[in-house]
């Protein structure tokens, strides 16, 4: 029964992650012109390079789509409001969301259960 519950939770998290990334990719660029295609391709080629991505807990304010990949999932850029004196600024960092942490924990428990 425990295995069934863990598998169901893991499947649900993976499915929701896949559908969220698909919607984000599909609806991200509403207007797309022919002049934009070459910079777009060059940008995507850079993102595939692991050395040029933004690591965990590093700032991603200017480049929100370039976070590195963690153990199972890609980190997500999460923004926070920082108040310095009376000035409020928006700062972003690459972090692992809570549901990704839960999925990684479920996978590690699942592996430990079937390792023996």
UniProtKB/Swiss-Prot annotation:
Report disulfide bridges, numbered on this chain.
53-68, 60-77, 67-94, 79-92
Q: Show the InterPro entries listed in the entry.
A: Spider_toxin_CSTX_knottin, Spider_toxin_CSTX_Knottin_CS
Q: Which domain of life is it from?
A: Eukaryota
**Where does it localize?**
Secreted; Target cell membrane
User: Which positions carry the propeptide annotation?
Assistant: 21-47
Summed up, the tissue specificity of this protein is: Expressed by the venom gland.
Query: Which Gene Ontology MF annotations are present?
Result: calcium channel regulator activity; toxin activity
| Function text | Spider venom toxin that shows calcium channel blocking activity and exhibits cytolytic activity by affecting the outer leaflet curvature and/or pore formation across the membrane. It blocks L-type calcium channels (Cav1/CACNA1) in mammalian neurons at nanomolar concentrations. Furthermore, it produces a slow voltage-independent block of mid/low and high voltage-activated calcium channels in cockroach neurons. Potassium ions, histamine, M-ctenitoxin-Cs1a (AC P83619), CSTX-9 (AC P58604), and CSTX-13 (AC P83919) synergistically increase the insecticidal activity of this toxin.
Q: What is this protein called in UniProt?
A: Toxin CSTX-10
Q: Which organism is it from?
A: Cupiennius salei
């Amino acid at each position: 029964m425990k295995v069934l519950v863990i598998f169901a939770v893991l499947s649900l998290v993976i499915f929701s992650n896949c559908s969220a990334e698909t919607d984000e990719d599909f609806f991200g660029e509403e207007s797309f012109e022919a002049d934009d295609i070459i910079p777009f391709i060059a940008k995507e080629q850079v993102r595939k390079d692991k050395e040029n991505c933004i690591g965990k807990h590093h700032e991603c304010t200017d480049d929100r789509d370039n976070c590195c990949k963690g153990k199972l999932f890609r980190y997500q850029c999460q923004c926070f409001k920082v108040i310095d004196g009376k000035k409020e600024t928006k700062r972003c960092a690459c972090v692992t969301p809570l549901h990704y942490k839960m999925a990684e924990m479920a996978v590690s428990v699942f592996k430990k259960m079937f390792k023996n």
